[in-house]
Design a protein with these regions (language model features):
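Aromatic- and glycine-rich peptidoglycan recognition patches
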Residues: 6-10, 24-27, 91-137
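Secreted/periplasmic proteins that engage bacterial cell-wall peptidoglycan
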Residues: 1-86, 92
Length: 137
């Protein structure tokens, strides 16, 4: 920045190796095992960087075009609040969408990589890469 202050780092990140080591597993405990947010929280807790409860998450910087650091916790937000739609760990942005580590229960998908496509006009907050932001605590 021109005023001599350090650039703002958006979101909380872990090394991607922390996410990779759980590939193929359903993360979380009890009734939350397999839920998307539980997977993200699990990786961050085991890396020593807990994200806190989802009700405390705040919307940060838009991921698409945001030059986000790999390993950053991201989620879809509505009106600045996390509404339990979807959370993931950012890997990279491609022309087609956001490559992430995630999991979900319906349909059942273990922790793994997938693409959240940039879907113009689609309001599916769980699958549209245009609707994701960094998670701020």
């Amino acid at each position: 920045m021109s005023n001599g202050e350090p650039a703002r780092v958006w979101g909380t990140a872990v090394d991607l190796s922390e996410a990779e080591k759980y590939g193929g597993h359903r993360l979380g405990q009890g009734k939350l095992q397999g839920e998307c947010a539980a997977g993200v929280q699990w990786v961050f807790i085991t890396a020593g960087k807990p994200l806190g409860l989802t009700k405390t998450w705040k919307q940060g910087k838009k991921v698409r075009g945001g030059n986000i650091r790999p390993g950053t916790a991201i989620a879809s937000f509505r009106n600045g609040k996390y509404q339990q739609d979807h959370a993931a760990i950012f890997i990279e942005e491609t022309e087609k969408g956001l490559l992430v580590w995630d999991q979900f229960n319906t349909p059942r998908k273990a922790w793994g990589k997938r693409l959240l496509p940039f879907s113009a006009g689609q309001k599916d907050h769980s699958n549209n890469g245009n609707l994701f932001y960094t998670i701020e605590k």
